Amino acid sequence: MVRNVDDLDFHLPSHAQDMLDGLQRLRSQPKLADVTLLVGGRELPCHRGLLALSSPYFHAMFAGDFAESFSARVELRDVEPAVVGQLVDFVYTGRLTITQGNVEALTRTAARLHFPSVQKVCGRYLQQQLDAANCLGICEFGEQQGLLGVAAKAWAFLRENFEAVAREDEFLQLPRERLVTCLAGDLLQVQPEQSRLEALMRWVRHDPQARAAHLPELLSLVHLDAVPRPCVQQLLASEPLIQESEACRAALSQGHDGAPLALQQKLEEVLVVVGGQALEEEEAGEEPTPGLGNFAFYNSKAKRWMALPDFPDYHKWGFSLAALNNNIYVTGGSRGTKTDTWSTTQAWCFPLKEASWKPVAPMLKPRTNHASAALNGEIYVIGGTTLDVVEVESYDPYTDSWTPVSPALKYVSNFSAAGCRGRLYLVGSSACKYNALALQCYNPVTDAWSVIASPFLPKYLSSPRCAALHGELYLIGDNTKKVYVYDPGANLWQKVQSQHSLHENGALVPLGDALYVTGGRWQGMEGDYHVEMEAYDTVRDTWTRHGALPRLWLYHGASTVFLDVSKWTQPSGPTQEH
């Protein structure tokens, strides 16, 4: 057909939504609905075409050669009427309210009737609700319902928060097999080891008649040589469950005396740093070379830097580092020379258990000078692309895949991000000098951002860095020694004790109950470059200097993990200042 210059292509933007709204209204007129679902005595008029589009279960039912394919009334058994009603409403409106009271029923019914989008959002909701009181139950529920990603993230939460979980009632109800799995975890992050011993004793005391026989086996899972001697002596002297068992007495005595038990690992929380180009390399105009060491950890107890296996991509800057499930992830960054650079989509992982770097699935977009943060069992990367929008994506380590996330509402290019209280917080401004900071918050359950108007938010910070500790968000910049803390519950910022020094191109990370700041600074008329570190005691509101980083890194990323410090004996540094 020949088009005429007067032809008009008309598009009604609201047409699709109008049709859905109209079909929803037609449900109240049974004559205009072509199928009625019968659920526990409740009748739900609807349209089989919409059900088939929303659910493979209904598509197979209505498109196949079954009695239901031709029947005007279809009965669904062994499902809750109210929940099916919610799912049918979702088909017509795209809206669903998930609560702690209905999430399990919704998950089960969505799995039964094959509503994949509902299963996915219920899984995200469960991850959002993870805490010490429910993580064991959510882990078991996830395994039962085939939500293996949810189960994996609940298991990771247990590993990272074992001491808190062990104090909850759910822990006391664990079957023996499950408890053994918990205690035997190679990466169970327990400090001190006494906590593991106290947890198993609490479990046995909850039902001593049935559980006392398992005590010798459970004791073999504890690093008894790391338990303080007074604790062991007290158990031997006053605990009936120990006194009545020769095997238990022998295990405690033998383990603490260092008799022929195998040497077991002792995990300690340490600060890890991956360095980019260093000052000496820039001055020489050279590419970084292997052998200089670009990956190290700081043992805050011994106050020493020790070398780790080098990050294999030496000539890179603008990358971001985050830790998740006690694994270290490095994403993005730029490669090439100063005059010819390009961003990468590369992502690397350093699993502590394997102790070597390996590539993981590449990001969907190349990113440089972006932020990354762990939240609810996933890694989020924020910004760093070439568009004038803050593009976001998330990485699921269970599926080794990246998923696009809603972009931030307000564009920022001078920013930092951190996960806190189940939300992702983005603090930043545009690159324009003295452009005011904005605070944005992302809810992973609804995949939605909001801009938070918060009193006393600092007006401007150059290269802001933020980190979460004890449910609060700490914020610093490289143009000031001032330190700010944000309480999300009260929506209030306040100042705390200032740092001793300025820190450029560094990181702010929580380690135990303290915050560590790393980064360099130029000092003196000749422009000497120093890379210093200091720690903030949140209880005493004081800063303490911790010396230099191993090398004069102009760019680096940092985080914290738990590792067996006895396995790493090669020193890293000390730095020779210029």
Swiss-Prot record:
- List the signal peptide residues: none
What PROSITE patterns is this protein classified in? BTB (PS50097)
- Name of one Pfam family that matches: Kelch_KLHDC2_KLHL20_DRC7
InterPro entries, per database record: BACK, BTB-kelch_protein, BTB/POZ_dom, Kelch-typ_b-propeller, Kelch_1, KLHL30_BACK, SKP1/BTB/POZ_sf
Keyword tags: Kelch repeat, Repeat
Q: Which GO terms describe its cellular component?
A: Cul3-RING ubiquitin ligase complex; cytoplasm
Any one GO biological process: proteasome-mediated ubiquitin-dependent protein catabolic process
- What name does the UniProt record give this protein? Kelch-like protein 30
The organism is Homo sapiens
From which lineage does this chain's organism come? Eukaryota, Metazoa, Chordata, Craniata, Vertebrata
